[in-house]
Structure formats: C-alpha cells, structure tokens
Amino acid sequence: MFRQSVFVIAIALALSGCAGRGEVLNNDPFERSNRFMFKVNVQLDNYVLKPVARGYLYVPSPVRRSVRNFFDNLAAPVTLANDILQLEGKRASTTALRFGINSTVGIFGLFDPAKRLGLEKHNEDFGQTMATWGMPEGPYLFTPIYGPSSPREFSGWIFDWMFDPMTHQDDWDLEKAIGRYAVDGIDFRADALTTLDEIERSSVDFYATVRSLYQQNRKSEIANGVTDIDDLPDLDALDDLDDF
C-alpha cells in the first residue's frame, strides 16, 4: 500500500503519463508467476486499498491537493539527482528551482507556486538514468506489493531510496516509512479510482493491458516524453491524473 509499491499506483502513474500504443515487446518470460502475483495484488487492492481510497475522497479536495503537492516536493531531490546524472542541465535547474520555491514560499511543499511561475514538474528515477546509459531493462516482473517492474527498475528504486532526504533523518524508522508511503499510495489510488475501474472493465485481459501500459509509459519516461508511438484512445479520466 505504498506509492509505486502498490501495483495500482504504478498503473495510475503509467496511465497519467502514457503516450501511446506502439509496438512494445512483452518481454515476459515469467508470465505464469507474474500473473499469479497480479491476481494476489488485485485482491489486496479490492479488499484493502480501494475501500480506504474511497473513504479518502471524503477529505476536502484542497487538503488532498496539498497532500499530493507535499509528496511531490519530497520526491524532488531524487529527480534532481537523476537529472544531473543524465546531464539534463535545464531540467535539473527547473527541479532545483521548484524545490526551493515550493519548500519555502509553498510552505514545505504544501502548495505549488512554482507551477504558477511556469516551472512544470517532471519525474526522473535511477531506472530511467540507467536506461539512458544503455543498460538493458531485463525481463518484465510483477512483484509482490511493488507491482510492475524489471530488474533495472527495481535496482534503480534502491538507488533512489538512498537519495530520498527522508531516509537520512535521525529518527527515521520503518514505522514512519510505512506511514509515509501508505498515505502517499492512498492519495494516488483515490485519484485513480474511476480510471482504473474503466480500464479493468474495458480490458479483455487486464494483466496484459497493465503490462502494455507500464512498458509504454517507461519508454516514454526514458525519452522524456518524446516518442514515435501512436496515440492511445482517449479516456477522459486520464486527463484528471495529469495534475498529480
């Protein structure tokens, strides 16, 4: 039930950034075990995360938006480190400015004045960085709790964890980490309720759809949104995720 640790959160991120349909190789030699874990995580979502997310929608929208802004701001140092490692000077400058402005004027990231100044948010992680360095992703994996991934992306998550400033606090422990990622994950899941339900209802094979969306999204993220793949069919609910 953590941000990007719960498979539905990873799907929500994939849907919000997915750029196209394209010819994407499945690269899924462990499909049988992956499908089993997918079913397990679907049940965890149905009986744990989804009910909590529905209740979270009763929290006023401005409060939920501030929660989202806060967690986005916490992720900025990780994005900045990867911007630098990818030699993306302009994007690194944008990330640094956003973090500085939102951490001060935005009151520890609760608000996003940087966006009103034209400094748009983007996300980077070490999985993307390794891809730009030419490291192969390895086979598709659907892991317990963490969700859609690959050996490259999973190892990248460990590196990103090291650059997360929260992990270096003296009083940081497992209980605080679980609380942080649980709230973050519930917030994302609440935003994606309608979208994911629509995707599941319209999919002949929900597992294959999730796999395809995830792989396409990672391809788009690695290319910083510049791809040569065709547009996906429009889904109105996807537009609602773009601001989160």
Predicted regions and their residues:
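Surface-exposed patches in mature extracellular/periplasmic domains of secreted proteins
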Residues: P62-R65, Q86-S93, K115-R116, E221-D228
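Post-signal peptide N-terminal segment of mature Sec-exported envelope proteins
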Residues: L25-K50, R54, D72
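A structured, mid-to-C-terminal "fold-capping" secondary-structure block
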Residues: G20-R21, E31, G134-F244
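Bacterial N-terminal signal peptides that target proteins for export
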Residues: M1-F7
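C-terminal motif of bacterial Sec signal peptides marking the signal peptidase cleavage site
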Residues: A14-G17
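Terminal hydrophobic membrane-targeting helix
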Residues: V24-R32, L57, S61-R68, L85-G89
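Mid-length scaffold segments of soluble, non-membrane domains
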Residues: N73, P77-P151
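Short, residue-level hotspots on alpha-helical faces of the histone-fold
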Residues: K50, N69, R98-N102, G106, ...
